[in-house]
C-alpha cells in the first residue's frame, strides 16, 4: 500500500509540530528525543518534556511497528483477522501539566494494516482526543467540545455525536463507575467510505487537537494554586493510572505485542497518589468535578440553550 508512506509522513510531521508548539508555550524546558528499534520489527521516536514551567511531563510518541500475528487486543472485535501479520503506526501523546487548573489531555491517531498472503490488506484508522480536568470550568468544556464538533462537521452531521458518545463510553472506569474526564472524540475501525476520506479525518483530528487544548492552557496557566489543589490533582491522577493499566486498549496492545515498555508507559504521570475512601467536602470545587463535570453531558446543546435564553 503506497498510501502508508503518506500516513507515516503526516504522523512524523504532526509529532514535530505538536512538540514545537508545546515547548514554545512552556518556555522552561524542551523535548528530549529517544529513537528506538523493536527486535520483532519496526521502531519509533519518543519525545519527552519533563520539569517544564507549565508541563510537569509531556510525552509525544511516534511508532511504526510490524509483527507476524495480531495480538488479542487488536483482534478481539475482528476475530476473522486473528493470526494475520500486521503493521501499526501512530502518534500518541499525553500531557500532564503542573498546575491543577490545567487539565491533563491525551490524543492519538493511528493506522492498522492486517495482511495475509494472497488477500487484500485490511486497514483501519483509529484515534481521538480527550480532556481530564481536575477543576472544571464550563467555558473550557464548551470550547473543547466545540473544537471537536467543528472538525467533525465536514465529515457528516452524525460524526461528532457518535464519536463523542464512543469517547464517553470508552474512557470510563467500570470498577469505579466513574468517567475519567469530560471526553472528546474516540473512534476505531474506521475504513469508510474510503481510505482518502478516513485519512483526511485523522488529519483533522490530529491537527485540531492543539486548537482545543492550547486556549485552555492560556486561560488557566497563571491561576494561583496551593497544597490542597495539588493533593487533589495527584489523587485524581491515580484514576488516570488505573484506567491506562486496566482498561486502555492501546496500552494492552503495546504490552501484548512486545512493544517498548518505556514508550508505552510514557503516558503515566510522574506523581500520583491514592487515599482510602476519599470524599471531597460538600459544595467544594473538588465536589463540583464529580457532580458537574464527570457525568456525561451534551455541552454544546446546553451552551446553545443558555445563549438563546440570554
Curated annotation (Swiss-Prot):
Pathway(s) annotated for this protein in UniProt: Porphyrin-containing compound metabolism; protoporphyrin-IX biosynthesis; protoporphyrinogen-IX from coproporphyrinogen-III (O2 route): step 1/1
Cofactor(s) required, per the database record: a divalent metal cation
Entry annotation: catalytic residues: 106 (proton donor)
GO biological process: protoporphyrinogen IX biosynthetic process
Binding residue positions for substrate: 92, 108-110, 258-260
Keywords (A to Z) from UniProt: Cytoplasm, Heme biosynthesis, Metal-binding, Oxidoreductase, Porphyrin biosynthesis
Region (Important for dimerization): 240-275
Enzyme Commission number(s) from the entry: 1.3.3.3
Catalytic activity: coproporphyrinogen III + O2 + 2 H(+) = protoporphyrinogen IX + 2 CO2 + 2 H2O
Subcellular location: Cytoplasm
Entry GO terms, CC: cytoplasm
Gene3D superfamilies per record: Coproporphyrinogen III oxidase, aerobic
Family: Belongs to the aerobic coproporphyrinogen-III oxidase family.
Complex and partners: Homodimer.
Name the record gives this protein: Oxygen-dependent coproporphyrinogen-III oxidase
Organism: Pectobacterium atrosepticum (strain SCRI 1043 / ATCC BAA-672) (Erwinia carotovora subsp. atroseptica)
Gene: hemF
Amino acid at each position: 500500500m503506497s498510501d502508508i508512506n503518506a500516513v507515516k509522513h503526516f504522523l512524523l510531521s504532526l509529532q514535530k509540530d505538536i512538540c514545537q508548539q508545546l515547548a514554545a508555550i512552556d518556555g522552561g524546558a524542551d523535548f528530549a528525543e529517544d529513537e528506538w528499534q523493536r527486535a520483532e520489527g519496526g521502531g519509533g521516536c519518543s519525545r519527552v518534556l519533563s520539569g517544564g514551567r507549565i508541563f510537569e511531563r509531556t510525552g509525544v510518541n511516534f511508532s511504526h511497528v510490524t509483527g507476524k500475528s495480531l495480538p488479542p487486543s487488536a483482534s478481539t472485535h475482528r476475530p476473522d483477522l486473528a493470526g494475520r501479520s500486521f503493521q501499526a503506526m501512530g502518534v500518541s501523546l499525553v500531557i500532564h501539566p503542573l498546575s491543577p487548573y490545567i487539565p491533563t489531555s491525551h490524543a492519538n491517531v493511528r493506522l492498522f494494516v492486517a495482511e495475509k498472503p494472497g488477500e487484500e490488506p485490511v486497514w483501519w484508522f483509529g484515534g481521538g482526543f480527550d480532556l481530564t480536568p481536575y477543576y472544571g470550568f464550563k467555558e473550557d468544556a464548551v470550547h473543547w467540545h466545540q473544537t471537536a464538533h467543528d472538525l467533525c462537521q465536514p465529515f457528516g452531521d452524525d460524526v461528532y455525536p457518535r464519536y463523542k458518545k464512543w469517547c464517553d463510553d470508552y474512557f470510563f472506569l467500570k470498577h469505579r463507575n466513574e468517567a475519567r474526564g469530560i471526553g472528546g472524540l474516540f473512534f476505531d475501525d474506521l475504513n469508510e467510505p474510503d481510505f482518502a476520506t478516513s485519512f483526511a479525518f485523522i488529519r483533522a483530528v490530529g491537527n485540531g487537537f492543539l486548537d482545543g487544548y492550547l486556549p485552555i492552557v492560556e486561560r488557566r496557566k497563571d491561576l494561583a494554586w496551593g497544597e490542597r489543589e495539588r493533593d487533589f490533582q495527584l489523587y485524581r491522577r491515580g484514576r488516570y493510572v488505573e484506567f491506562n493499566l486496566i482498561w486502555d486498549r492501546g496500552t494492552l496492545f503495546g504490552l501484548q505485542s512486545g512493544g517498548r515498555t518505556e514508550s508505552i508507559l510514557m503516558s503515566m504521570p510522574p506523581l500520583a497518589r491514592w487515599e482510602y475512601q476519599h470524599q471531597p467536602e460538600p459544595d467544594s470545587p473538588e465536589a463540583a468535578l464529580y457532580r458537574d463535570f464527570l457525568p456525561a453531558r451534551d455541552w454544546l446543546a446546553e451552551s446553545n440553550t443558555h445563549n438563546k435564553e440570554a
